[in-house]
């Protein structure tokens, strides 16, 4: 294990078994973390922390594993799975309040490496999609870029 205490070899194995694809893991550290000294050791893990455009990285990814980052919502808009890995959850919530909406996020959560590999192994896309759909309906702040069309339709109805 290394960066973020993730067992990258185990993750690669479980992703390859689950999705039947060759896997590369792109690792992007928080901007406040000096990632230049971190050696990921696995040739299938690539440190992309210095890549300037996170949107490009999201477009090239099939799945996201993140923690408390709002990037999870951006990635959800791409209709791709997000998994939350929260090994420091207890200390994190003791140090700072989470957004009220965090507990409502529809993403599978893991607090340990073994849990993370289990939720990936047991992942069912249809159940995940339904949770995301219900979240989108419930969260009135959520927008899929159709606000102008919806507004015009509302005006026409009046």
Task: Give the label of every model feature segment.
Residues 11-14, 50-53, 70, 95-96:
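A generic local structural motif
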Residues 1-39:
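Conserved catalytic-core segment of nucleotide-activated headgroup transferases in glycan assembly
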Residues 39-41, 70-140:
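Catalytic binding pocket for nucleotide-activated donors in carbohydrate/polymer assembly enzymes
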Residues 10, 14, 115-118, 150, ...:
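Alpha-helical elements of Rossmann-like donor-binding domains used by nucleotide-donor carbohydrate transfer enzymes
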Residues 3-11, 53, 143, 147:
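Soluble or luminal CAZymes and related metallo-dependent hydrolases
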Residues 26-73:
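Donor nucleotide-activated moiety binding/catalytic core segment of transferases
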Residues 144-158:
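C-terminal alpha-helical cap of glycosyltransferases
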